[in-house]
Each structure stands twice: as C-alpha cells, then as structure tokens.
C-alpha cells in the first residue's frame, strides 16, 4: 500500500522535491537499489499477451509456466544497464508482524476479486476478466527464486532483505552503498531514503518520465523534521496500522505542522471532538499502535549496509542461455542478442551523469510553491500497487 496520498501531498505542498527525468541516461553512473518485489509485480501485470482479442494472460512457455517475470527482469535490467545505471535488486524477507492486518486485508480483496472474476467469466466480459485477473496477480516464492537465479547468471547483484525490501533499499542509500532507491512505494521516503526514483522499471513504450523525489528538499518545503514526517505518513495511512477516519493527508499535514507530533495532534482531536473524526481504540491507551508503527519506520530491520557485498560480475553466457532457452523456453536468437547488449552495457555504466536531462516541475503558486503536474496518462500511467508478501 505504501503511504496513502503522499505523492499528491508532495506535489501540492513540496513540489520542488520532485523532478522529471526525461531520459534514463541522465542517471548514468548511479547505483540504484531496486525493490525487486515491486518490480516483479509490475512485470507480471504489464507483460502479458492476448489472443484473438480475448482477456490478456501472463506470458508462459510451452509447459504453461509463467515467464512474464523473467522477461521483464531480463529486458528491463539490460535497458537500465545500457543507460549506465548499476542496479542492485533487493528482495523482501519475512513480513513484519505489524503488517499482518494489511496482509489479511489484501487476502480478503483477492477473494473478492476471485468471485468477481468468476462472474465476469460466466458473462464473457473480456474487459472485466482482464481487470480482475490483474487484481489476483501476486509474485510467488518460485517467481522470486527464478529472478534471483537469472540475476546471478547476468552478473547483477541481488540481496534478500531481513524484512521489508524498501527499508533495506533506504538503508543502502543512507549508508552510501547506492545513490538512490527505485520503487513505487512512497514509504521508502518514510524509511529515510535520500533519493527515490519512481517508474524506473516501467515499459519504455509508455513514454512517461522517471520521477526523482528528494527527501531533504521535501522536509525543507514541508517545514518538518524526518521524525515529524514519519508521524505525517502514519496519519496519512500506512501498512502497519489503520488510519484515523476523518483525517486525510491534508488534515494530517496541517495537524503535524501545527502540533509537531501525533501525541499532540491526538490530544487536540480528542479535546475538540472534531466532527467526522473517529480515532481507533488501538490508537489510544498505554501502548498505542502508532508508536509501534513509528518504531518500524525509524528503526526498521534492515541489511547492514557496510557489510553487504555488492559486486557486478560478467554474465555467465552458457548458463544464461541454458536457463532461459532450455529451461524456460525463450527464443535463442533473442537471448543471444540480449546477452551481447548486456556485455556492451558494462562500458556504459561508467558514463558520467548528465544533469542537463533533468526538467524542473513547473510553477503553480508563484515563487513560494511550484505545483507538480499530474502523472501523464492518468491512472493507467501510474504503476499498480503490489500484492506482495
């Protein structure tokens, strides 16, 4: 889920923290920790085929095994490396106990989608079948293992986080091992990543720019410390606890900006008995849940940035061909062509970063505030939220 409404809030209240990167090559030379679970979900959703105008299905080999995740990981990783990026994939570890409630909700939503899919199939509505099929997509442990093996053979480093992938992405960036994190999850900022890239793994056919979001600039414009920003994110709505009914991102922002903490803001809400505001019982008492959520963001379980090995190696060509062609049914000529591109990309990775490709978001509210435009392509351009873990 990430943080509800945070992107829109930043576009309105801290627009200068967001930049559009029109060309991926502008990021050349940077190592980026990529949320692998999010990327896998994107590939499973986006890389599909439709026969005869019917509903789309994930790509499969002759044995009926899904290969969308491998196709996406292979092609998009090579594209990043050809543009000079140095990707480091970070996979999810065990889900935190506090996320059990959110995971249960996702399970319920999948059950609802399954029922809706059955009804749509009965009616033969291809559009609805496609829509509900995508809601049922999730990356399996086997998908993860397939991609880890693929990355190993490509010579691309990958890490399995002890817990949340985006938290370890942030830790690697804060520890100076990578420049930024690449994920659609806005809670990477809550975990403290200095620079966040969104849309890195989106298909180039969509022709939408990468978004760069800088945390320090966001905090400056919001006039908040990172601790206050964490409280804001919890109030907006996160994976670790239910939010307060009647308190959306704007009210949360105003509340934290004025009262500096959730504790102080809650005291005011209770005192004023604000209309339409319902504070969950778990937010009250001696051990309110928001304190545990705060701890999850400020002291997450992450990889040791200093001790983690990150090394890019030469691809193992023969083994890579065997894995993709013989085991997973890829076309050999295409795989060989892609391997040639992969090998050539090694020289590109040392290319200097080209700041001239950056485009500052346009002004909206004069000198004080510059409002960022809505995402191109509307909802279809925005990357779907994962059904991970």
Swiss-Prot record:
Residues holding Mg(2+) 2: 185, 187, 239
Region named N-domain: 1-110
Keywords of the record: DNA damage, DNA repair, DNA replication, Endonuclease, Exonuclease, Hydrolase, Magnesium, Metal-binding, Mitochondrion, Nuclease, Nucleus, Phosphoprotein
Coiled-coil intervals: none
Biased composition (Basic residues): 367-389
E.C. code: 3.1.-.-
Keyword Ligase: no
Binding site for DNA: 48, 76, 164, 237, 239
Keyword rRNA processing included in the entry's annotation: no
Cofactor(s) the protein needs: Mg(2+)
Region named Disordered: 103-124, 362-389
Biological processes annotated in GO: base-excision repair; DNA replication, removal of RNA primer
Residues the entry annotates as binding Mg(2+) 1: 35, 92, 164, 166
Cofactor binding note: Binds 2 magnesium ions per subunit. They probably participate in the reaction catalyzed by the enzyme. May bind an additional third magnesium ion after substrate binding.
InterPro entries: 5-3_exonuclease_C_sf (IPR036279), Flap_endonuc (IPR023426), HhH2 (IPR008918), PIN-like_dom_sf (IPR029060), XPG-I_dom (IPR006086), XPG/Rad2 (IPR006084), XPG_CS (IPR019974), XPG_DNA_repair_N (IPR006085)
GO molecular function: 5'-3' exonuclease activity; 5'-flap endonuclease activity; DNA binding; magnesium ion binding
Positions of region (I-domain): 128-259
Subunit structure: Interacts with PCNA. Three molecules of FEN1 bind to one PCNA trimer with each molecule binding to one PCNA monomer. PCNA stimulates the nuclease activity without altering cleavage specificity.
Family of the protein in this entry: Belongs to the XPG/RAD2 endonuclease family. FEN1 subfamily.
Protein name according to UniProt: Flap endonuclease 1
Lineage of origin: Eukaryota, Sar, Stramenopiles, Oomycota, Peronosporales
């Amino acid at each position: 889920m990430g943080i509800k409404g945070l992107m829109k809030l930043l576009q309105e209240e801290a627009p200068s923290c967001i930049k559009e990167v029109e060309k991926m090559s502008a990021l050349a030379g940077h190592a980026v920790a990529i949320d692998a679970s999010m990327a896998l979900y994107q590939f499973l959703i986006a890389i599909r085929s439709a026969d005869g105008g019917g509903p789309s299905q994930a790509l499969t080999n002759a044995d009926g095994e899904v290969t969308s995740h491998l196709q996406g990981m292979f092609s998009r990783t090579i594209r990043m490396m050809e543009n000079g990026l140095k990707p480091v994939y970070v996979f999810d570890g065990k889900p935190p106990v506090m996320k059990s409630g959110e995971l249960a909700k996702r399970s319920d939503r999948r059950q609802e989608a399954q029922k809706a899919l059955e009804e749509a199939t009965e009616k033969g509505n291809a559009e609805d079948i496609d829509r509900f099929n995508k809601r049922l997509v999730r990356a399996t442990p086997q998908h993860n293992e397939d991609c880890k093996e693929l990355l190993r053979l490509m010579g691309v480093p990958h890490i399995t986080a002890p817990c949340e992938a985006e938290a370890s992405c942030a830790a690697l960036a804060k520890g100076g091992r990578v420049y930024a994190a690449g994920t659609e999850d806005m809670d990477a900022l809550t975990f403290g990543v200095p620079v966040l890239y969104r849309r890195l793994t989106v298909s180039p056919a969509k022709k939408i720019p990468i978004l760069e979001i800088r945390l320090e600039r966001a905090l400056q414009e919001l006039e908040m410390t990172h601790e206050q920003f964490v409280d804001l994110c919890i109030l907006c709505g996160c994976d670790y606890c239910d939010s307060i009914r009647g308190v959306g991102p704007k009210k949360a922002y105003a509340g934290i900006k004025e009262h500096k903490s959730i504790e102080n803001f809650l005291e005011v809400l209770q005192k004023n008995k604000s209309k339409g505001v319902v504070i969950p019982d778990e937010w009250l008492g001696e051990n309110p849940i928001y304190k545990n959520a705060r701890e999850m963001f400020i002291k997450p379980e992450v990889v040791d940035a200093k001790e983690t090995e990150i090394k890019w190696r030469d691809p193992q060509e023969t083994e890579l061909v065997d894995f993709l062609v013989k085991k997973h049914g890829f076309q050999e000529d295409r795989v060989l062509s892609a391997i040639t591109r992969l090998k050539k990309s090694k020289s590109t990775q040392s290319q200097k970063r080209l700041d001239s490709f950056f485009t500052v978001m346009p002004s909206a509210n004069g000198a004080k505030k510059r409002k960022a435009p809505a995402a191109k392509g509307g909802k279809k351009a925005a990357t779907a939220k994962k059904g991970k873990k």
